[in-house]
């Protein structure tokens, strides 16, 4: 099945297993990896990212912004972190503070974002795509992001040591197999893709 679906992508001008990172590739890979077992689809083109819980027989949908590759990886990371109960709620039942957060709100944001961004870093490393932490506060960017960068970087290394299972790891392996042609993960990939502010 995988070869057939990647062939379909190739007919539309998107080459699988190349340095080109397309959301169409991610959608196909996500479907192959998770659609059947978790009844979840990856959907691009949203003005804002959003998770729509399964309802009335419809699958759950992970909506990512526009056609942004990193947005797709980031939203998949949130999905991988969310437990069974959270995945039954729209946007996982979280309240989101928009741009313009004050310093205290930004610190709270960073606390809850370390884990998903650590997974996102591993996803980027697995497919050879540049990674930079997202402060997600364009109106009031903090002057120093180094503590947050360090926390994300260290959490990613911890995940490599302690969590070789679950949806996050399954996705890392799928990406590495597709983009790097190996099911293994090389720790140096993290340093290769990590970009400091």
Predicted regions mapped to residue ranges:
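An active-site-proximal "capping" alpha-helix that borders the catalytic cofactor pocket
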Residues: 110-126
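Active-site recognition of the HExxH zinc-binding catalytic motif
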Residues: 70-83
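Pan-zinc metallopeptidase signature
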Residues: 135, 139-197
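Short helix/loop segments within enzyme catalytic domains
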Residues: 122-137
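Post-HEXXH active-site segment of zinc metalloproteases
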Residues: 59, 81-114, 133-142
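Short pre-active-site segment immediately N-terminal to the catalytic Zn-binding motif
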Residues: 55-71, 106
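Auxiliary, metal-adjacent structural segments of Zn-dependent hydrolase domains
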Residues: 1-56, 106-111
């Amino acid at each position: 099945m995988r070869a057939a679906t990647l062939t379909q992508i190739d007919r539309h001008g998107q080459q699988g297993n190349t340095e080109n990172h397309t959301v169409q590739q991610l959608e196909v890979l996500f479907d192959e990896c998770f659609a059947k077992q978790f009844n979840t689809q990856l959907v691009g083109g949203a003005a804002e990212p959003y998770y729509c819980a399964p309802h009335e027989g419809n699958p759950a949908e992970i909506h990512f912004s526009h056609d942004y590759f990193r947005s797709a990886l980031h939203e998949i990371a949130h999905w991988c972190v969310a437990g069974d109960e959270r995945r039954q709620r729209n946007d996982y039942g979280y309240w989101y503070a928009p741009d313009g957060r004050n310093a205290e709100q930004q610190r709270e944001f960073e606390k809850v974002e370390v884990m998903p961004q650590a997974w996102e870093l591993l996803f980027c490393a697995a497919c050879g795509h540049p990674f930079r932490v997202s402060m997600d506060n364009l109106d009031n960017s903090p002057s120093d992001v180094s503590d947050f960068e360090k926390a994300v970087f260290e959490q990613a290394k911890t995940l490599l040591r302690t969590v070789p299972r679950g949806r996050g790891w399954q996705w890392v392996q799928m990406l590495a197999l597709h983009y790097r042609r190996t099911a293994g993960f090389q720790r140096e990939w993290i340093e290769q893709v990590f970009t400091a502010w």
